[in-house]
Regions:
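Feature marking well-ordered beta-strand scaffolds used for ligand recognition
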Residues: 1-199
């Protein structure tokens, strides 16, 4: 099990669920955070932290855990630094793209947007692929995306069948976009939310 901590991530062996034990930790990239999100793709963990300056995305090769019998403090495999504070990271396993959302102001301005797109087909060598944002949304009119799902559409609409579609929560609206071509992202629609808030 991968468990987010204030100061990093712990790796817990749950082979025997009655007697789980911590085999090691990966320290945080920066400072303590109450919010840490972890997703897994191709035997790699992708770790982000909210409200933490310059945390970025820590990438950890989980195969390093194999055969470990004593508590170990691990080092990251790679640090993706084109974002800073990130609320959540969504991964479309069918396409090999990650979407960093809920990006805080600590992010490098040229990469700041609603959903920051990262090509993770080679997990230990991620590359920036684009920015999705609808500036008619977000409480500051900046296209902020708090959470999202990114899927291959296989529904009844033939115009979008087989395309990679983003469904995003943008504070003031719910957004739908075609993110198939990372160099030509297309807003499809939005549904405005009145009296929005966080609970």
């Amino acid at each position: 099990a991968l468990v987010g901590l204030l100061l990093g991530v712990s790796f817990v062996d749950v082979t025997d669920p009655i007697n789980p034990f911590v085999i090691g930790v990966l320290p945080t990239e920066t400072v303590s955070s109450l919010w840490r999100d972890i997703k897994v793709y191709k035997d790699h963990a992708f770790i982000v932290a909210d409200n933490v300056y310059n945390h970025g995305v820590q990438i950890f090769d989980l195969t390093q855990l194999r055969g470990v019998t004593e508590f170990t403090v691990f080092e990251k495999t790679y640090h993706y630094d084109k974002v800073g504070s990130v609320h959540n990271i969504a991964i479309n396993e069918e396409t090999g793209y990650a979407y960093a959302v809920g990006i805080g102001s600590a992010s490098q301005s040229e990469y700041m947007c609603g959903a920051h797109i990262i090509d993770i087909n080679d997990p230990s060598n991620p590359t920036y692929s684009g920015c999705l944002g609808d500036e008619s949304t977000g409480r500051y009119g900046d296209g902020y995306v708090h959470d999202g799902q990114f899927v291959i559409y296989r529904g009844p609409d033939s115009d979008y069948y087989g395309k990679e579609i983003a469904f995003t929560s943008n504070e003031t609206a719910l957004g739908i976009a075609d993110v198939t071509d990372k160099s030509n992202l297309k807003i499809i629609s939005k549904f405005d939310q009145l009296n929005f808030g966080y609970v």
